[in-house]
Amino acid sequence: MAKQEVAAKKVKRPTALKRDLQNKKKRLNNKIYKSRVRTAVRSFQESLVKGDETLSKAKLDEVYSILDKCAKKGVFKLNKVSRTKSRLAARAAAKA
Protein backbone atom coordinates (compact mmCIF):
# COMPACT_ATOMS: atom_id res chain seq x y z
CA MET A 1 0.00 0.00 0.00
CA ALA A 2 1.39 3.30 -1.08
CA LYS A 3 1.54 6.23 1.25
CA GLN A 4 -1.04 8.81 0.47
CA GLU A 5 0.14 12.31 1.12
CA VAL A 6 -2.51 14.91 1.37
CA ALA A 7 -1.16 18.16 0.02
CA ALA A 8 -2.50 21.34 1.54
CA LYS A 9 -4.87 22.87 -0.94
CA LYS A 10 -4.19 26.48 -1.82
CA VAL A 11 -6.85 28.71 -0.42
CA LYS A 12 -7.93 31.83 -2.22
CA ARG A 13 -7.63 34.63 0.33
CA PRO A 14 -8.94 38.15 0.35
CA THR A 15 -6.28 40.78 -0.23
CA ALA A 16 -6.52 42.18 3.30
CA LEU A 17 -5.82 38.78 4.81
CA LYS A 18 -2.88 38.26 2.46
CA ARG A 19 -1.42 41.65 3.44
CA ASP A 20 -1.86 40.73 7.09
CA LEU A 21 0.07 37.49 6.60
CA GLN A 22 2.84 39.29 4.70
CA ASN A 23 3.06 41.96 7.41
CA LYS A 24 3.43 39.29 10.10
CA LYS A 25 6.35 37.75 8.19
CA LYS A 26 8.02 41.13 7.69
CA ARG A 27 7.48 42.09 11.32
CA LEU A 28 9.13 38.86 12.46
CA ASN A 29 12.12 39.36 10.14
CA ASN A 30 12.52 42.98 11.24
CA LYS A 31 12.41 41.92 14.88
CA ILE A 32 15.15 39.34 14.27
CA TYR A 33 17.43 41.86 12.54
CA LYS A 34 16.86 44.54 15.18
CA SER A 35 17.69 42.05 17.90
CA ARG A 36 20.92 41.08 16.10
CA VAL A 37 21.90 44.75 15.89
CA ARG A 38 21.24 45.37 19.59
CA THR A 39 23.23 42.29 20.57
CA ALA A 40 26.16 43.24 18.34
CA VAL A 41 26.21 46.84 19.63
CA ARG A 42 26.11 45.60 23.22
CA SER A 43 29.05 43.24 22.63
CA PHE A 44 30.95 46.09 20.94
CA GLN A 45 30.40 48.36 23.95
CA GLU A 46 31.54 45.60 26.30
CA SER A 47 34.74 45.19 24.28
CA LEU A 48 35.34 48.95 24.60
CA VAL A 49 34.99 48.71 28.38
CA LYS A 50 37.52 45.87 28.45
CA GLY A 51 39.94 48.03 26.48
CA ASP A 52 40.93 45.40 23.91
CA GLU A 53 41.49 47.33 20.67
CA THR A 54 41.66 44.36 18.31
CA LEU A 55 38.49 42.85 19.75
CA SER A 56 36.62 46.15 19.61
CA LYS A 57 37.73 46.67 15.98
CA ALA A 58 36.42 43.22 15.06
CA LYS A 59 33.15 43.87 16.89
CA LEU A 60 32.78 47.25 15.17
CA ASP A 61 33.22 45.59 11.77
CA GLU A 62 30.57 43.04 12.74
CA VAL A 63 28.14 45.81 13.74
CA TYR A 64 28.82 47.65 10.47
CA SER A 65 28.08 44.50 8.48
CA ILE A 66 24.79 43.84 10.25
CA LEU A 67 23.70 47.48 9.94
CA ASP A 68 24.47 47.49 6.22
CA LYS A 69 22.40 44.34 5.75
CA CYS A 70 19.53 45.98 7.64
CA ALA A 71 19.69 49.03 5.38
CA LYS A 72 19.76 46.81 2.30
CA LYS A 73 16.69 44.87 3.42
CA GLY A 74 14.80 47.99 4.47
CA VAL A 75 14.71 47.24 8.19
CA PHE A 76 16.40 50.57 8.96
CA LYS A 77 16.57 53.69 6.85
CA LEU A 78 19.96 54.58 5.44
CA ASN A 79 20.21 57.77 7.52
CA LYS A 80 19.69 55.85 10.78
CA VAL A 81 22.36 53.34 9.78
CA SER A 82 24.83 56.12 8.91
CA ARG A 83 24.11 57.96 12.16
CA THR A 84 24.54 54.81 14.26
CA LYS A 85 27.79 53.88 12.51
CA SER A 86 29.12 57.40 13.02
CA ARG A 87 28.32 57.39 16.73
CA LEU A 88 29.90 53.98 17.26
CA ALA A 89 33.03 55.02 15.36
CA ALA A 90 33.26 58.15 17.53
CA ARG A 91 33.06 56.04 20.69
CA ALA A 92 35.78 53.74 19.37
CA ALA A 93 38.00 56.71 18.51
CA ALA A 94 37.47 58.27 21.93
CA LYS A 95 38.55 55.07 23.69
CA ALA A 96 41.59 54.56 21.45
From Swiss-Prot:
Disulfide bonds: none annotated. GO terms for molecular function: small ribosomal subunit rRNA binding; structural constituent of ribosome. One of its GO terms (cellular component) is cytosol. InterPro entries: Ribosomal_bS20 (IPR002583), Ribosomal_bS20_sf (IPR036510). GO terms for biological process: translation. It comes from the Bacteria. Keywords: Ribonucleoprotein, Ribosomal protein, RNA-binding, rRNA-binding. Residues 1-27 are annotated as: Disordered. The keyword rRNA-binding applies. Belongs to the bacterial ribosomal protein bS20 family. Binds directly to 16S ribosomal RNA. PANTHER family: 30S RIBOSOMAL PROTEIN S20, SMALL RIBOSOMAL SUBUNIT PROTEIN BS20C. HAMAP family: Ribosomal_bS20. This is Small ribosomal subunit protein bS20. It comes from Protochlamydia amoebophila (strain UWE25).
